């Protein structure tokens, strides 16, 4: 995921925005001119949020991180 890419967030919310900032723990997305921050917990809550970015097609972003005993792949 790179800054400037379009991202679609579905689940409890259904929005499309532009990725503004990406770090190991957060993603900031500009949606309708407002920056919204999503955390690692948001990515982990697969029942709440699913993240897609737009390139040639939509695909799900599953961050690969290790936090203590938590291993998300």
Task: Give, region by region, the residue ranges found by the protein language model.
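Conserved beta-strand residues within beta-sheet cores
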Residues: 4-6, 16, 58
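Basic/aromatic-rich interaction segments and small domains that mediate binding to polyanionic partners
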Residues: 12-47
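Short coil-to-beta transition motif at edge beta-strands of beta-rich domains
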Residues: 1-11
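Intrinsically disordered, low-complexity, charged/polar segments
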Residues: 34-73
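Generic short N-terminal amphipathic or hydrophobic helices
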Residues: 6-8, 25, 60-61
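Secondary-structure boundary/capping motif
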Residues: 4, 28, 53-56
